[in-house]
């Protein structure tokens, strides 16, 4: 494997390991500071909004100033964010930490993605981006597991460790990453108004609505999950880490071994509908579960539906985009970020009203997603009949 590709993968792994590390300790951390579910929603939303705003500028700056520089700046901001969260003793400091963390993600991700595109042979780009996705998932899976066990020492320790990982990634990037002499700006092109008139916007309406609705529901559930289990059955950070890591492993296994097989037998829309119905059933079981082991077992399988929906939507966008792959990817990313921003805000407020309210909302949103899919399938069937 190319040395620079390996370093880029390692950087991404460290970043997402660092993000995952802190998930199991958030309930203890919030209670220690006397914060509520609404406060947690604000912290998560601040990160998502900051990333959404900075990402386009991060991509443009990466092209103008060099991707290595933007990656390194992003890694430093990541470390600053984690150390601030570790020492923070009031809500304002934590909010500032999350804003800086979102800025770091908005710089590192476009930089890494662009650099992988630059240094990958054309026949290996798809494979390299596939590896990147798998590595991101691996960081999310291992992070909560490690963080939960670190919390046995101190609930602030995972944040210090994540900050240290950022510094390690920064040093490796300084030493081992080099900007190529020739670089591509694909994916960060300037928006030309005349191009917009050539785009068939109608084909993107339903995917955009579906992406917004689903990211809204999924982020709402995932944001409050650790707080939900801690309050409902008194899960410790270690218990939360086992639940999330187990769920992540099962989700990854289904993605790796079964997603392609399902796609041979189902269209993306049909598969999304079935995945949503599966998620609804499991979420209903979660509402009725009231003891340690039943919630642990449900936790191992609840994320499978969500983990299958995401690549299916991405695949659907890609298939309808034609030659507008960059445009479709931008729409997908933008509306996913919007959902990730709005979902935690509402879920946090609902959690303070009733512990099960965010779960009810996720169930309702998932059912709305099924309805949207059925409407889209009916619309496409009519178009197909008209074209015959």
UniProtKB/Swiss-Prot annotation:
GO terms for molecular function: xenobiotic transmembrane transporter activity. One of its GO terms (cellular component) is plasma membrane. It is a multi-pass membrane protein. It is found in: Cell membrane. InterPro entries: MFS, MFS_dom, MFS_Efflux_Transporters, MFS_trans_sf, Multidrug-R, Tet-R_TetA/multi-R_MdtG-like. Signal peptide: none annotated. Its main location: membrane. It holds the Pfam family MFS_1. The chain crosses the membrane at residues 5-25, 42-62, 69-89, 99-119, 129-149, 157-177, 201-221, 239-259, 269-289, 293-313, 331-351, 355-375. The keyword Membrane applies. Keywords: Cell membrane, Membrane, Transmembrane, Transmembrane helix, Transport. Involved in quinolone resistance. May constitute a membrane-associated active efflux pump of hydrophilic quinolones. Belongs to the major facilitator superfamily. TCR/Tet family. This is Quinolone resistance protein NorA. It comes from Staphylococcus aureus (strain COL).
């Amino acid at each position: 494997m190319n040395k620079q590709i390996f370093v880029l993968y390692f950087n991404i792994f460290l970043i997402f390991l660092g993000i995952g590390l802190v998930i199991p300790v958030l309930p203890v951390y919030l209670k220690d500071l006397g914060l509520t579910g609404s406060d947690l929603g604000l912290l998560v939303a601040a990160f998502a909004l900051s990333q959404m705003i900075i990402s386009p500028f991060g991509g443009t700056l990466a092209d103008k100033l060099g991707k290595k520089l933007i990656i390194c700046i992003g890694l430093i901001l990541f470390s600053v964010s984690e150390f601030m969260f570790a020492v923070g003793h009031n809500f304002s400091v934590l909010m500032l930490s999350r804003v800086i963390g979102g800025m770091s993600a908005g710089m590192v991700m476009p930089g890494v993605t662009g650099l992988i595109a630059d240094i990958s042979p054309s026949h290996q780009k798809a494979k390299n981006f596939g590896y990147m996705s798998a590595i991101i998932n691996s960081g999310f899976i291992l992070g909560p597991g490690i963080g939960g066990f670190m919390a046995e020492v101190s609930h602030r320790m995972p944040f210090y460790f994540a900050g240290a990982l950022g510094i390690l990634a920064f040093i490796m990037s300084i030493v081992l990453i080099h900007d190529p002499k020739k670089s591509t700006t694909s994916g960060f092109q300037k928006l030309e108004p005349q191009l917009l008139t050539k785009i068939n916007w109608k084909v993107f309406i339903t995917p955009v609505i579906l992406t917004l609705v689903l990211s809204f529901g999924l982020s709402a559930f995932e944001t409050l999950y650790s707080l939900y289990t801690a309050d409902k059955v008194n899960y410790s950070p270690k218990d939360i880490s086992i639940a999330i890591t187990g769920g992540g492993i099962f989700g990854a296994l289904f993605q790796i071994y079964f997603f392609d097989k399902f796609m041979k037998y189902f269209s993306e829309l049909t598969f999304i509908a079935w995945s949503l119905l599966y998620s609804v059933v499991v979420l209903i079981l979660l509402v009725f579960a009231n003891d340690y082991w039943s919630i642990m077992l449900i936790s191992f399988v609840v994320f499978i539906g969500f983990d299958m929906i995401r690549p299916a939507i991405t695949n659907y966008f890609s298939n309808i985009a034609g030659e507008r792959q960059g445009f479709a990817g931008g729409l997908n990313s933008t509306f996913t970020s919007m959902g990730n921003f709005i979902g935690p805000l509402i879920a946090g407020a609902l959690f303070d009203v009733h512990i099960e309210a965010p779960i009810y909302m996720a169930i309702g949103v998932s059912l709305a997603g099924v309805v949207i899919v059925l409407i889209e399938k009916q619309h496409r069937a009519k178009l197909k009949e008209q074209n015959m």
